[in-house]
C-alpha cells in the first residue's frame, strides 16, 4: 500500500512539473488509464524535468484525446508540440483530425503541417483587423442585444477567417471591442431576459392522438442490429492496446499492412469468430449469450464461426462434455463452420513456444507454485529468468520428452514482473502433466496454458473478432504481447459483460459441486440454468435467444438480470407455440346429480385461443360425464365478493362445458375435509357466472381420468445473488424449490404426449413432458407460471 502511495505522489509531482495545478494532478491519478497515458506522453516528449504550462496543457490533451488508431504517430506530434511548432488548441485539434483519418499508415510531413497550420503566424494586427470587420458586419445586432450578444458566434466568425489565430488574443480583442461600442454594463444588461409565452391552439383530440403515433421513436440501429458496434475485418489496422512496461517504454500492438493483407487474402475479407468452451462441464445460459455474440456476429456478416474446444487440461476434459456441447450448440440453433480443438494445434503451439524462447521471450523456470505466487506478490524476477537461451531450449525439449518430473519445471513468458498489470507477471506458457489427453492420447506430456494457447490459436485460425467477457479485459496486454512477440496476426478483441441472472449460480465449480453432491438431480435438473436443464424444463432455444438479444451486447458489468425477465421471454414464446389443455393438480370430485350416470357428452375444447370454428385441428375432444374433477383450491365453504370459484349455492362455468351450481357438500369422517361436491349443471347455459374453472371428467362410469405426475419448480436459491454469501452459499438453497404432485388428473388426449412436448395447462401455466416419463406414467415439468392466474385463490 505504501508503494502505491509513493507511486501516486511521484505521478503528482511529475504532472505538476508540466504546469498542471495540484487539484487537476490529484484528480488525474484517480484514473489509471489517463495516468498511464499522461506518464507515457511526458516520457515520449522527453519533458520529465518539466515544461511551460501551455505545452503541458497540450500534452494533457494528447494523453486524453489522441486517436487510438494512430498511436504510432504520437511521438511525431509530441516533437512538434515541444518544439513549439504546434502551440494552440486549434492546431492540436487539427492534428487529431489528421491522424484519425490517416490511421497507422505513413503520411507526408508537408501535408500534416499544412493541415495543422504549422509555420503560419497570425499577427495581433491581422486578428484586430478581422475582429473589426466582424463587428462592422454585426453592429446593428450588437447594439440591439448589447451584452446579451452571443460572443461565441463572433468568436466563431473570426476563427473561420483566421483558423490559426491565438484564441486568447481573439477573446481579448472581442471584449475590448464590446466595451468600446457599448460602454459599461447597465442594470438592464444584468437582468435575465423574459421569454414571452406564445399561445398555442389546442389541436383536436383526434389530431393529438395521431401526432403521438407519428412521433413514436423508431428503434435505434443498434437495437435492430446489435452487431453494428463491431468493425469490418479490413479495419483491423488500429493500435489494439498499449502495453506499458515498468521501465517507461510502451509497446503499441497493431497489424502491419503486410500482415493484415495476408490475413484478408486467406479469409477473403469474411468475418471469422469462434465459440471456445472448455469441455469440463455443461453449458449454461451465460454460454447462450456467448453463442449469440460469436455465432450471431458471423451469421449477420455472412462469415464463419468455429466451435473450438479449449481442451488444454487433459485431467478436466470428458467425452460426455464434448458430446453435450456439440449437441446443445445445434439445439440453440447455431451451425459451426468447423469444429476444432486446441489440441489440433499442439505441434504448432510447441513450435511457436520454441521460437518464443529463441527470440528471448520465454524461459524454463523451476519455481514451485508457491514460490511463483510469492515472487509475483513481491514483483520479483525468478532466479532462472535470465538463463541462456540455449539452456532453456534444451530444458524445454527435455520437458517434452518426459525427462523432467511433473512440477519441477514450467515454461514462462518473459514479460514484465514489475508491471502494474498482474497479467504481465511472466505467465506460464507450458506445464508438465503426465496424463493422457482425451483426443491427443499419450503423445504429449507438456500442455499449453490458456494464456498461451488462446490468443495463439485465435491467430492461427485467422479469427477476425475475438470476443469474450469483461473479466478477460486485463489480459489484453498479455494477449497482444504474445502475438507481437511472435510476429503473428492480431485479431480484434472486444469484451462484453458477463450474463448474471438472479437466484442461481453459474460458476462451473459451484454447479459441479451441487451436481456431484446431489443437491440437484444432475446437470439437466430443471431448476438449473444450464441449457440442458432449461430444455428439460420446457424452455425453447428461441426464447433463450430472444432473452439474450433483449439484454444486448453491453459492457456494463456487475448488473444482475432478474430471472423474471427470462420468464417473460419464455411466456411470450410458449403463448404462441404451446397448445392448450386441461390438468387438475389436486382433484376434488364433483358429482353432477342431474346428469344420468351412463350419459356422456362429447365437447370441443380449444387447443388455441384464437381458433377458427372451421379448423378441426385447432380443437380436441373432452368428455363431460356425471363425475368431473376440479381443483381443491377452486372450492370454498364460504363465498366472498372477490372470489370466483365454487361455493355452496354458487355457480361457476366449467370451461368449454356448462355452468354448474353447488347443491351439497359431502365431508369426510373428520367433518372438515371436503370429500366430494354435488352440483347441478345448466344444459341450456342460461346462467352466466363470472368464474370459469378448468376440469377433467371420467370418460366412463367408475373409470378415473389419466393420472399424471407434475413437478412444480421454484427458484433454486432464496437470495437474488447467492454468490454474495461467500462460503455460506449452500445454506441459501431453497428447500421448497421442487414439489412433486403424483396424483394429478389429465384429459385423455394427453396420453399420447411425447418427451419434450409442451402445453399450456389452462389457468396453471406452461408444462413440458419430462424424460422420466414411462408408458402409462407421464411426468410433466412446470416450465413457467402464467402471467395472470385468473380465478386461482381469488380473482
From Swiss-Prot:
ATP binds at residues 278-280, 284-290, 469, 498-499, 506-508. Residues 200-212 have a biased composition (Basic and acidic residues). Disruption phenotype: Lethal. In heterozygous plants, aborted ovules. Its main location: cytoplasm. L-glutamine binds at residues 310, 450. GO terms for biological process: glutaminyl-tRNA aminoacylation; post-embryonic development; reproductive structure development. Keywords: Aminoacyl-tRNA synthetase, ATP-binding, Cytoplasm, Ligase, Nucleotide-binding, Protein biosynthesis. The keyword ATP-binding applies. A motif ('HIGH' region) lies at residues 277-287. Belongs to the class-I aminoacyl-tRNA synthetase family. This is Glutamine--tRNA ligase, cytoplasmic. It comes from Arabidopsis thaliana.
Amino acid at each position: 500500500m505504501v508503494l502505491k502511495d509513493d507511486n501516486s505522489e511521484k505521478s503528482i509531482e511529475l504532472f505538476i512539473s508540466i504546469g498542471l495545478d495540484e487539484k487537476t494532478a490529484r484528480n488525474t491519478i484517480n484514473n489509471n488509464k489517463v495516468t498511464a497515458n499522461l506518464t507515457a506522453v511526458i516520457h515520449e516528449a522527453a519533458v520529465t524535468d518539466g515544461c511551460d504550462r501551455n505545452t503541458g496543457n497540450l500534452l494533457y490533451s494528447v494523453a486524453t484525446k489522441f486517436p487510438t488508431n494512430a498511436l504510432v504517430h504520437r511521438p511525431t506530434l509530441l516533437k512538434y508540440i515541444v518544439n513549439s511548432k504546434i502551440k494552440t488548441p486549434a492546431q492540436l485539434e487539427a492534428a487529431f483530425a489528421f491522424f484519425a483519418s490517416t490511421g497507422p499508415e505513413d503520411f507526408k510531413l508537408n501535408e500534416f503541417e499544412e493541415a495543422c497550420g504549422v509555420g503560419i503566424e497570425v499577427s495581433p494586427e491581422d486578428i484586430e483587423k478581422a475582429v473589426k470587420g466582424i463587428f462592422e458586419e454585426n453592429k446593428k445586432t450588437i447594439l440591439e442585444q448589447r451584452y446579451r450578444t452571443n460572443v461565441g458566434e463572433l468568436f466563431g466568425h473570426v476563427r473561420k477567417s483566421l483558423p490559426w489565430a491565438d484564441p486568447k488574443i481573439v477573446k481579448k480583442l472581442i471584449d475590448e471591442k464590446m466595451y468600446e461600442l457599448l460602454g459599461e454594463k447597465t442594470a438592464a444588461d444584468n437582468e435575465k431576459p423574459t421569454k414571452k409565452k406564445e399561445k398555442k391552439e389546442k389541436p383536436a383530440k383526434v389530431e393529438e392522438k395521431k401526432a403521438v403515433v407519428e412521433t413514436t421513436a423508431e428503434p435505434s440501429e443498434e437495437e435492430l442490429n446489435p452487431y453494428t458496434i463491431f468493425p469490418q475485418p479490413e479495419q483491423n489496422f488500429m493500435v489494439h492496446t498499449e502495453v506499458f512496461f515498468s521501465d517507461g517504454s510502451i509497446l503499441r500492438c497493431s497489424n502491419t499492412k503486410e500482415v493484415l493483407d495476408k490475413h484478408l487474402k486467406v479469409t477473403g475479407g469474411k468475418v471469422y469468430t469462434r465459440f471456445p468452451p472448455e469441455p469440463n462441464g455443461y453449458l449454461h445460459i451465460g454460454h447462450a449469450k456467448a453463442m449469440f455474440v460469436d455465432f450471431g456476429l458471423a451469421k449477420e456478416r455472412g462469415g464463419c464461426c468455429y466451435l473450438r474446444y479449449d481442451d488444454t487440461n487433459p485431467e478436466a476434459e470428458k467425452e460426455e462434455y464434448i458430446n453435450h456441447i456439440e449437441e446443445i450448440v445445434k439445439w440453440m440453433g447455431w451451425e459451426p463452420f468447423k469444429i476444432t480443438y486446441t489440441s489440433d494445434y499442439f505441434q504448432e503451439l510447441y513450435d511457436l513456444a520454441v521460437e518464443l524462447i529463441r527470440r528471448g521471450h520465454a524461459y524454463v523456470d523451476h519455481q514451485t507454485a508457491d514460490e511463483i505466487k510469492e515472487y509475483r506478490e513481491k514483483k520479483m524476477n525468478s532466479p532462472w529468468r535470465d538463463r541462456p537461451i540455449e539452456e532453456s531450449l534444451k530444458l524445454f525439449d527435455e520437458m517434452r520428452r518426459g525427462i523432467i518430473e511433473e512440477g519441477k519445471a514450467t515454461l514462462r513468458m518473459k514479460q514484465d514482473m514489475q508491471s502494474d498489470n498482474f497479467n504481465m507477471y511472466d505467465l506460464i506458457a507450458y506445464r508438465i502433466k503426465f496424463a493422457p489427453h482425451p483426443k491427443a492420447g499419450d503423445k504429449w506430456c507438456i500442455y499449453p496454458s490458456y494464456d498461451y494457447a488462446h490468443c495463439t490459436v485465435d491467430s492461427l485460425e485467422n479469427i477476425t473478432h475475438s470476443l469474450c467477457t469483461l473479466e478477460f479485459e486485463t489480459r489484453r496486454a498479455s494477449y497482444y504481447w504474445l502475438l507481437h512477440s511472435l510476429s503473428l496476426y492480431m485479431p480484434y478483441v472486444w469484451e462484453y459483460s458477463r450474463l448474471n441472472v438472479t437466484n442461481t449460480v453459474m460458476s462451473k465449480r459451484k454447479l459441479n459441486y451441487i451436481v456431484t453432491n446431489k443437491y440437484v438431480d444432475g446437470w439437466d435438473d430443471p431448476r438449473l440454468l444450464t441449457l440442458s436443464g432449461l430444455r428439460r424444463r420446457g424452455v425453447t432455444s428461441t426464447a433463450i435467444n430472444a432473452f439474450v438479444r433483449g439484454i444486448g451486447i453491453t459492457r456494463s458489468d456487475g448488473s444482475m438480470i432478474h430471472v423474471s425477465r427470462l420468464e417473460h421471454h419464455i411466456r411470450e414464446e410458449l403463448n404462441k407455440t404451446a397448445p392448450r389443455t386441461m390438468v387438475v393438480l389436486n382433484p376434488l370430485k364433483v358429482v353432477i346429480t342431474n346428469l344420468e350416470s351412463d350419459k356422456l357428452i362429447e365437447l370441443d375444447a380449444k387447443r388455441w385461443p384464437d381458433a377458427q370454428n372451421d379448423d378441426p385441428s385447432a380443437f380436441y375432444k373432452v368428455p363431460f360425464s356425471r363425475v368431473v374433477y376440479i381443483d381443491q383450491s377452486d372450492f370454498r365453504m364460504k363465498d366472498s365478493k372477490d372470489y370466483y370459484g365454487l361455493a355452496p349455492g354458487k355457480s361457476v362455468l366449467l370451461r368449454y362445458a356448462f355452468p354448474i351450481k353447488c347443491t351439497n357438500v359431502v365431508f369426510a369422517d373428520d367433518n372438515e375435509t371436503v370429500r366430494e361436491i354435488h352440483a347441478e349443471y345448466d344444459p341450456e347455459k342460461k346462467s352466466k357466472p363470472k368464474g370459469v374453472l378448468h376440469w377433467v371428467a371420467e370418460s366412463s362410469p367408475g373409470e378415473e381420468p389419466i393420472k399424471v405426475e407434475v413437478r412444480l419448480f421454484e427458484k433454486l436459491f432464496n437470495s437474488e445473488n447467492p454468490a454474495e454469501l461467500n462460503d455460506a452459499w449452500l445454506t441459501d438453497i431453497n428447500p421448497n424449490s421442487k414439489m412433486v404432485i403424483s396424483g394429478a388428473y389429465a384429459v385423455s388426449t394427453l396420453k399420447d404426449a411425447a418427451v419434450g412436448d409442451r402445453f399450456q395447462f389452462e389457468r396453471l401455466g406452461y408444462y413440458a413432458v419430462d424424460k422420466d416419463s414411462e408408458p402409462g406414467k407421464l411426468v410433466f415439468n412446470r416450465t413457467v407460471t402464467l402471467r395472470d392466474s385468473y380465478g386461482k385463490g381469488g380473482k
